[in-house]
Amino acid sequence: ARHFVSGFDRPNIQYRITQKRNPRQQLIDFLRREHSGDAGIIYCLSRRKTEETAAWLQQQGFDALPYHAGLSADERLRNQQRFLREDGVIVVATIAFGMGIDKPDVRFIVHLDLPRSVESYYQETGRAGRDGEPATAWMVYGLQDVIKLRQMMDGSQGNEQFKRLERIRLDAMLGLCEITSCRRQALRQYFGEQAPEQCGNCDTCLNPPPTWDGTEAAQKALSCVYRTGQRFGVAYLIEVLSGVESERVLSNGHHCVTTFGIGR
């Protein structure tokens, strides 16, 4: 029998991840600038958010439909059929949407909330560009996403081992968001594949974020921790490193340590 082996790389998908500032404005700018008239899927964490986002996009002139498990079977089927058969339809969905959906010309996948894991992210973004043409996987994330997901995990029915595994997966997803190196390389390495250092088709390759060598700053901070007796919090250590002659710093005599003011 013949075996077909496929890797995890989807070279036609451009991966882009950015922090939430004004997510609705960021979304509308992305759609109007790059994907006006294209079919796509927008993933949200809650059912309520899918409906609110779909309604808002309709007001902005987009053909957007909600999809989640709380809708009636008839409405889910109707929205799904419109997405599959018509051009330029956007589905705003929870993760309930996508399994078994094979629409080759999906031009973008948007995540308005952080996925639970790299596995989920890869599976959901993989629904874009199945025709081999260029597609975009675009995500905005924020600290509130992480807090919300951790609360959901802690409140789930799983045992402690399951919850710990869920937290590890979430941490890996957050790590993918915060790296400054190639996202495609990180994705492929996560799944055990070798990959070149740069793909040339993700945000960190196309617009490398500014970086700096924090070695010296870390050494100064650790030295300050040691010289102040390893018993003070971050705010106090910042005062010492910044050379602030506060009442507490003076009373402890830490204006005399060698690390006083070296972080100015």
Regions found by a protein language model. Name each.
Residues 26, 172, 220-223:
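Pre-recognition alpha-helix immediately N-terminal to the DNA-recognition helix
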Residues 1-160, 165-168, 195, 203-204:
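Helicase motor core with emphasis on the C-terminal RecA-like subdomain
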Residues 31, 83, 177, 225-229:
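Short helix-to-turn junction characteristic of helix-turn-helix DNA-binding domains
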Residues 133, 145-146, 178-182, 194-197, ...:
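Proline-centered turn/helix-capping motifs that create local helix->coil transitions or kinks
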Residues 165-196:
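C-terminal accessory regions
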Residues 165-167, 196-264:
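Accessory DNA-binding and partner-docking regions appended to nucleic-acid-acting proteins
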Residues 140-144, 179, 190-194, 205, ...:
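Short acidic/histidine-centered micro-motifs embedded in hydrophobic/aromatic stretches
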